[in-house]
């Protein structure tokens, strides 16, 4: 009977079987009253059940029980073989780490979402049962695996709410389609800009801005202590030994959430070799140490709401201290700032965007349960701050680069439109943390500054521009993108052109801030596009 309707039913059953583990895995405690024996999957009036014991036999000895053989017909043979490995592959996480995350505000939101799909047999949300199963499974000698999460689920059965699951998949498909349409529109507009620039003829573009400069510089680490905020943080300072022309222009680099000063060390060296003084602070409430503290049980959340205030204030204090300590060496009235992710927000706040409590009220009270924008889990933490004007902008900032910024809600249209300094926004088409469409492409259309640039890295992810540290776990291509060195070379060239133009005041570099120059840099593995304006017709085509 089921074989006759194999088309759509087969596709959806296949999705459920292959993604059962993926629905559980991202939300990585309490002794169960009973252990789950079956997984129930409903499809309209039809209900299927799968004994967990059959999965255990298949995972441990490779034998396909009759109750599992039925489902094997709905999955490609190679995928069915992969299922065995997926079930028993341990996930490297400690019980404390998984518990800390699941009890954090962000973890609880993720549990709520997943609990809509993975429920108890009585059709109750799986929030508490999933949390219990994950933590209990992490205590097992073999470590946390999909199989032992299923075995530790503390009710007789696990029910997959297929209707809700398919709704999420449909929403995701729509977002992907909208994003692809917008990206295609951006790339087309960039190609048209490049063609027009080539027709008009460009200035000499003989310089290879990816290459290091010839300026010698020193590196030192200074620790700043802000007594008023009880906050101490280190800063790596790269100083040119002999600035070629008067005071050295200054660039500040702000790292992302869970990162640290070395993330953009490659860019600091590059800019310093071209005569810039570069300051790279480490933000103590949202750096790698903060994440480690969370996973060790020493912190309660990924980043406290106060980080939305403290990060810009770190940089304002840094500039104050440099002004008093390096008078006569640095031009601190013409400063550029570059930031990635949470650092992208930081750079936009310093450039003129204040926390937008009206937008936070709309988007976060409560958080839209259907949103697929993961960055809102962080942005909405700012809603817990007392609503007031924190005066985060700094008049010394004369240009900003925001890479994969998160700002659509915490700053929103009304605040992003207030920024009047030159601005470059960098997006990755495959960014699943701060998705390109809602976080960069759409916000770019809200900008009113006359000097604005949208840079798009096709196949770029949230992590493509980051340099790994020695302690980093190697990440797969799906996370990093095809070749991070390509993205890093792009950032060297474009950030140098931007800061030479708007911070060092060298107008001859403005020609490099063009679609044509980006086209000349572009590589097949990660195509590069740059544009300065999205025409109304292009916006309409992209659904913006």
Language-model features, listed with the residues they occupy:
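Conserved alpha/beta-hydrolase "acid-adjacent" motif
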Residues: 432-439
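Short beta-strand/loop motif that positions the catalytic acidic residue
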Residues: 419, 425-427
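N-terminal cap/lid segment of alpha/beta-hydrolase-fold proteins
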Residues: 192-246
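Short beta-strand element of the alpha/beta-hydrolase
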Residues: 246-256
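Mature extracellular/secreted ectodomains of secretory-pathway proteins
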Residues: 48-51, 59-202
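Gly/Ala-rich beta-loop-alpha elbow adjacent to hydrolase catalytic centers
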Residues: 256, 339-347
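Cap/lid segment of the alpha/beta-hydrolase catalytic domain
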Residues: 258, 262-265, 270, 282-309, ...
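Alpha/beta-hydrolase active-site loop
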Residues: 300-332, 349, 359-378, 386
């Amino acid at each position: 009977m089921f074989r006759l309707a194999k088309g759509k039913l087969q596709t959806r059953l296949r999705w459920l079987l292959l993604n059962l583990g993926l629905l559980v895995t991202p939300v990585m405690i309490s002794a169960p009253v009973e252990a789950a024996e079956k997984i129930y999957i409903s499809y309209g009036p039809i209900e299927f059940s799968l004994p967990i014991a059959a999965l255990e036999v298949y995972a441990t000895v490779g034998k396909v029980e009759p109750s599992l053989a039925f489902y094997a017909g709905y999955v490609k043979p190679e995928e069915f073989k992969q299922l065995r490995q997926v079930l028993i592959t341990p996930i490297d996480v400690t019980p404390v780490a998984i518990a800390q995350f699941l009890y954090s505000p962000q973890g609880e939101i993720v549990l709520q979402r997943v609990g809509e799909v993975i429920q108890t047999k009585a059709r109750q949300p799986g929030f508490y049962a999933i949390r219990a199963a994950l933590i209990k499974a992490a205590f097992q000698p073999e470590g946390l695996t999909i199989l032992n999460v299923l075995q530790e689920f503390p009710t007789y059965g696990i029910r997959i709410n297929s209707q809700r699951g398919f709704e999420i998949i449909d929403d995701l498909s729509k977002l992907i389609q909208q994003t692809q349409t917008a990206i295609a529109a951006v790339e087309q507009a960039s190609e048209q800009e490049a063609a027009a620039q080539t027709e008009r003829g460009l200035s000499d573009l003989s310089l290879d801005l990816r290459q290091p400069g010839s300026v010698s510089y020193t590196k030192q680490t200074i620790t700043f202590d802000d007594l008023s905020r009880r906050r101490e943080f280190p800063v790596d300072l790269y100083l040119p030994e002999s600035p070629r022309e008067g005071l050295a222009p200054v660039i500040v680099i702000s790292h992302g959430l869970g990162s640290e000063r070395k993330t953009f060390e490659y860019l600091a060296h590059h800019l310093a070799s071209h005569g810039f003084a570069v300051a790279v602070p480490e933000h103590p409430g949202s750096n790698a140490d903060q994440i480690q503290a969370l996973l060790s049980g020493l912190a309660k959340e990924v980043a406290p709401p106060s980080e939305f205030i403290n990060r810009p204030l770190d940089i304002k204090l840094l500039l104050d201290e440099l002004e008093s300590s390096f008078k006569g060496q640095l031009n601190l009235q013409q400063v550029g700032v570059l930031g990635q992710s949470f650092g992208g927000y930081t750079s936009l706040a310093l450039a003129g965007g204040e926390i937008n409590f009206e937008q936070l009220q709309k988007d976060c009270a409560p958080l839209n349960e259907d949103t697929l924008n993961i960055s809102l889990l962080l942005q909405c933490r700012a809603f817990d701050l007392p609503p007031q004007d924190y005066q985060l902008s700094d008049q010394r900032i004369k240009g900003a680069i925001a890479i994969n910024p998160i700002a659509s809600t915490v700053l929103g249209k009304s605040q992003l439109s207030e920024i009047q300094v030159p601005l470059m926004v960098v997006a990755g088409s495959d960014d699943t943390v701060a998705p390109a469409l809602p976080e960069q492409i759409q916000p770019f259309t809200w900008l009113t500054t006359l000097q604005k640039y949208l840079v798009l890295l096709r196949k770029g992810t949230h992590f493509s521009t980051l340099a790994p540290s020695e302690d980093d776990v190697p990440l797969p291509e799906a996370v990093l993108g095809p070749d991070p060195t390509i993205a890093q070379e792009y950032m060297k060239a474009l950030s140098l052109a931007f800061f030479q133009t708007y911070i060092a005041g060298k107008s001859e570099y403005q020609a490099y801030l063009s679609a044509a120059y980006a086209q000349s840099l572009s590589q097949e593995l990660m195509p590069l596009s740059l544009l300065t304006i999205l025409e109304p017709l292009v916006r309409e085509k992209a659904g913006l």
